Amino acid sequence: MDLEAKLHEIRKPIMVLGTSSGAGKSLTVTAICRILKNLGEEPIPFKGQNMSNNAWIDWEGGEMAYSQALQAFACGINPSAEMNPILLKPQGNSTSEVIHLGKSIGTTTAQNYYKDWFIPGWEVIKKSLKSIYELNPNCRLIIEGAGSPVEMNLIHRDLTNLRVAKYLNANCLLVTDIERGGVFAQIIGTLELMKPEERKLIKGIIINRFRGDLSLFEDGKKWIENKTQIPVIGIIPWLNDSFPPEDSLDLIEKKSLSKNHEIKVGIIKLPSISNFSDFDPLENEETILIEWIRKSKNLSTYDFIILPGSKQTIKDQKFLENSGLSQDIRDYSNNEGNIIGICGGLQMLGTTLEDPYFKEGAKNYSEQKINGIGLLPLKTTFFKKKLTRQINTKSIWPCQSQINGFEIHNGQTILDDSQSSLKINPIFEDLDLGWFKENNKGGTIAGTYIHGIFENDSWREQYINLIRKSKNLPILNKKSISYKKKRESIIDNLANEFHKHLNLTSFLS
């Protein structure tokens, strides 16, 4: 298929650009995907290049940004790495892991990325677009841009914004966040920095996160339309629903919505945290309050502690040790505390971490082997190749239930025979996916490689009941609200709000 020759035959793509990072591009795309699905169309999300450590694994083991996976759920389809052909995963020190079509193909510095990776990156994007249209000839792509489309020092190497828009001749929407202030300057400045042929692609402007009476912006709307000759097709009100943030900048502002909590959870905010969407199911539990822990403190006020995934496990373990948090966690464990580690968190709960190939943050030979927190008799060695796959297994503890999720990690974890006094048991029928042990004084220490473990409703409910029992709280006998149903409800509510305030009619011809 010659995509360039067939562009006149395909349904016109819709592309969402933003005046800045955090303007609301991801949520706007998610909402439009669900709106079009409900209208009987075949929307497919696409983002040529994303930078995020919040990842998803598709059914073929391909790695992609979690935000595009969510957008696929909004479309009612399975996520595929072709929806996000380039994923950059920051590793610190201005370096990133480069993933093309779901597979890790190397690392690069910010300085060298556009010099070495621009041409192959653009070819990968075109290859993905061609494949999507070959498999789905009646689809309509809903494309997300990145940051601002007019970063003048980078625009000649743009892989995500106007290059894609021009290639597909997409109908573009420009979204801006009025909550941050300065929307008039942002809109006019963005449009003024575009070339005439680029500006012609902008077919509508969206004002996002407006607080108060929408009619109060009517004069502002008229001014923008008169100045730009582009219609303001939507003024989206401030939405209070929880929704997974795309990157760690948003994570800092994310707070639990639970008010009448019975269980207080502390999650360690690692410098290189990854896959923080693992905890969205807990955010949606009415009885749970989540707090993010950023520095050394007495942890005794928490009912359980979570050590999340990490993109740089050695580096983050050194942070825990140097900050005093490692000792805080050990003290918490000795005081009947409940702890669970996920992926890198599991590895850090072990006795040793070895990084012979400098894959997980070791800076020199003295850091190639370091001690873990030492609560589980496990040792981890990091190798050159990482494991990415979907998981379907059964749990043994804290209940017997079907478990779905995914693995995405470097390193192999085995029992540390030198710590035979620390007895542990498997959590799953697949014995290498997780372990737990009960403290002599009460409390449990557990760790698993499965991302998405808390999305499994029965498992989550029984783990929470384990904590409730330790607090002498009544066991919750009713079934937990299905997280996947809750996620669908959030997407529906998001789409309904956008549909009320967004005029897409002219884009659906």
Swiss-Prot record:
CDD domains: CobQ_N, GATase1_CobQ. One of its GO terms (biological process) is cobalamin biosynthetic process. The keyword Lipid biosynthesis does not apply. GO terms for molecular function: ABC-type vitamin B12 transporter activity; catalytic activity. Gene3D superfamilies: 3.40.50.880, P-loop containing nucleotide triphosphate hydrolases. Pathway: Cofactor biosynthesis; adenosylcobalamin biosynthesis. InterPro entries: Class_I_gatase-like, CobQ/CobB/MinD/ParA_Nub-bd_dom, CobQ_GATase1, CobQ_N, CobQ_synth, GATase_3, P-loop_NTPase. The keyword Secreted does not apply. Disulfide bonds: none annotated. Keywords: Cobalamin biosynthesis, Glutamine amidotransferase. Residues 262-459 form the GATase cobBQ-type domain. The active site is at C343 (nucleophile), H451. Pfam families: CbiA (PF01656), GATase_3 (PF07685). Belongs to the CobB/CobQ family. CobQ subfamily. HAMAP family: CobQ (MF_00028). Catalyzes amidations at positions B, D, E, and G on adenosylcobyrinic A,C-diamide. NH(2) groups are provided by glutamine, and one molecule of ATP is hydrogenolyzed for each amidation. This is Cobyric acid synthase.
